[in-house]
Amino acid sequence: MNTGNRIGIFGGSFDPVHTGHVLVSVYTLEILDLDRLIVVPVFNPPHKKTVAPFEKRFEWLKKVFEGMEKVEVSDYEKGRGGVSYSIFTIEYFSEIYKTKPFFIVGEDALSYFEKWYRYRDILEKSTLVVYPRYCGKPYHEHARRVLGDLSEIVFLDMPIVQISSTEIRERARIGKTLKGFVPEEIREEVEVFYGA
């Protein structure tokens, strides 16, 4: 099945997309030597609701990534409809590119990964790639207990991403600048959108 295409899938709510997401994309492309990184905003997340509508989040992602080589922003999950489960996205792009994709998640996802829909299938049908966030050790220990052998998981050697979309929304709500938190292409629009 493997065509040799090195494809990464970077899903998330991107509510909003921030400089940490851009950093993860740059390092992922470089470290994994990807042919393509597909950024997939969630349409209908199973565990939390988004603040910004899909169209707005998709538009921001397009603006931020339009000049970045090898990056594609996909609206697959909107087109699919229903609840946005990662396994369906992985299976879809596996079939399109005839390869086992890399699936990129934040380190904090390891603390509840076993709660993801068909998480064993995710581990089987993709190579899990984890980028660092905050302190990783407790997450790794939890993942080891629940998932067992972590040797198949790729842990990216890159700066720790300490920015969160939740923090950004709160900063905007109380009128603080988002300079340095979100890319300049969308900063003013994001400040207004989430502002009080």
UniProtKB/Swiss-Prot annotation:
Gene3D superfamilies given in the database record: HUPs
Catalytic activity: nicotinate beta-D-ribonucleotide + ATP + H(+) = deamido-NAD(+) + diphosphate
SUPFAM superfamilies: Nucleotidylyl transferase
Source domain of life: Bacteria
Pfam family, one: CTP_transf_like
Pathway field: Cofactor biosynthesis; NAD(+) biosynthesis; deamido-NAD(+) from nicotinate D-ribonucleotide: step 1/1
EC number from the UniProt entry: 2.7.7.18
Any one Gene Ontology molecular-function term assigned to this protein's record: ATP binding
InterPro entries per the UniProt record, alphabetical: Cyt_trans-like (IPR004821), NadD/NMNAT (IPR005248), Rossmann-like_a/b/a_fold (IPR014729)
Gene Ontology biological-process entries: NAD biosynthetic process
Keywords: ATP-binding, NAD, Nucleotide-binding, Nucleotidyltransferase, Pyridine nucleotide biosynthesis, Transferase
Reported function: Catalyzes the reversible adenylation of nicotinate mononucleotide (NaMN) to nicotinic acid adenine dinucleotide (NaAD).
NCBIfam families in the cross-refs: cyt_tran_rel, nicotinate (nicotinamide) nucleotide adenylyltransferase
Protein family per UniProt: Belongs to the NadD family.
The protein's name: Probable nicotinate-nucleotide adenylyltransferase
Gene: nadD
